[in-house]
Structures are given as structure tokens and as C-alpha cells.
Amino acid sequence: MINLSQKNVVQVANLTGFIKDNVEKVMRLADILEFICSTQWKDKLVLKGGTAINLFYRQLPRLSVDIDLDYIGQSKEEMGEDKERLWEFLQTSLYQKNYSLSPKRKRYFALDSAVFQYVNNAGNRDNIKIEINYLDRNHILPIKEMPLATPVVQSDITINVLDVCELYGSKLAALLGRCKPRDIYDVYGLEKDNIVSDMDMLRKCAIFYNCIAGEANINEVSSDILDGVTERDINRQLKPVLKKSEKFNRSEVISELKEYLKELFALTEKEKLFVEKFNAKQYCPELLFEDEQILSRIAHHPMALWRMR
């Protein structure tokens, strides 16, 4: 169980150099994840996004602000049965942990998004957003089961997490689609620390997630999109989750990332054809991947098939 006491939060904040209220938020994120993974829902959910990257693969260079999960039950029928049960489970369990469900919640066939409010140790109101995607339930690479061990929080309970290559592939797709400051920071960490060695697989994962997201055509997108992130965006959306001592040079980072993206996204002819056919409502994963196990896993990917409608 995560120690959420004010004394522990202050101590960890002082040791790590992060803002105290945001340290408490990360501890609460971890506490919720730990609780979920101590129940029958552990085998039905996998963690993804920036929280997965920073809690499990990068020793928390920045703090996380939400929980992004994929449901991984296989059949549509199983998903339909589990969706309402999981929603009720989250509401009931977090209410018992003194969280209240915000009216900002959104419920769709493909996604449940809930904002849970709480009062922190300093007496300030804050919230944690939890999103569960039900159409990304098939994955390119095998899911990892990993322990939580960071400078801010540790747990003996293991958590299902996407493979690092797939995580960063989806993060790259997010960068090209929405280009938020935290996406820039996470991808810069990928490039700077050489976290993924298989660049071909990384590119293919990014292409796949870009296509199923439907946000921007990777054959046409320009790295100039990074220029749209301003110093004001960095100050408001990124710096509060960094260590107080960390410096972030926007122009230098964007310049390096542009070169990295240019090299990474030199698509092969087959990769270009996959994108063209996907945009023409033809799903041909064999143009992107050759591995039979990967093709078997994503042959009936619900989101990819939904995009074909």
C-alpha cells in the first residue's frame, strides 16, 4: 500500500525536487493502479501513455497526471459484459477511497473517461483522470508485467504495461497528431537516452498508431508542427511536472527532434503503401509487418477495422 501521509509526501518531494502537490498526485495514481491490480481486473487492463513511460521505463524524469488504460478482453461480447462492471467497480472503489466522480465524465462505446476529485494533504482540490479504451484491445507486441520502482513511489504488485517500443510508437503518433509539450518531452527523452534500439519496429508502431488514431496522415505531416508549441505552453503544461531544478530549452529540443523525426520517418515503399491503402479503407497489415505472430495479434484489431467503415 502506498504511503500517502503528508509527512511522506513532503519527504519525497524534498528528496526528488518535484512540486509537493504533484508528488502526491503521482502517489495517488500509483495507489489506484496498485489497488486495481490487486483485483480480478488486473488481467483485463494494460497501462499505456506517458504514465507508463515515466513510471516504468524512465525512472520518473517527469511526473504523471493521469491513468490511460487499454481493456484487453478479447471478444466484443466479453467487452460488453465487462464495460459496465468495470465502470461500477471504479466508481464504488474510488468513492470508498474518498474520491468523488466529477460531472466531466464521458462515456462512449470506445472509451470511458472519468475525472475523480480529491482534497490533498495541503487542503487543495485536485483530480485524477482515468481513461479506458475498449477498441485498442489488441496489441502489436506482447504485454509486459512489471514492478513499480521509482524514486517517488514503489510497490510489490506488478502491473501490465505495453512494450516500450509500442509505447513510444503510440507516443510518436500522439506527437504528430496533437503535439503537446509533454509529448515533446517524452519523445526527446526517447531520442536522447536511446531507449528503443529497434528503430524499424518503432517506426512501424508509430505508423500503425498514427493510422488508427485518424488524426494526421503520416505521409503528409511535417515536423514543423513542433513550432506551434510556445514557451507559454511549456511553462503552463510541462514545467509544473518537472523537477524544479530542471532546465528545458525549447528551441534546442525542437531543433534536435526535427532531425530525429526526419531520420526516423523515412518510410519504405511498403510502409507508404500501407498508409495509402489504410486511408482508402483497405486494411493490409502485412504491408507493415512480416512477423506472423504480430499479424495474428492485429489481424482483427477493433480500432483498425472500425476505421475501415
Predicted regions and their residues:
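Structured mid-to-C-terminal alpha-helical surface segments
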Residues: 1-45, 55-67, 71-309
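Glycine-rich beta-strand-to-loop/alpha-helix junction loops that act as flexible
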Residues: 47-51
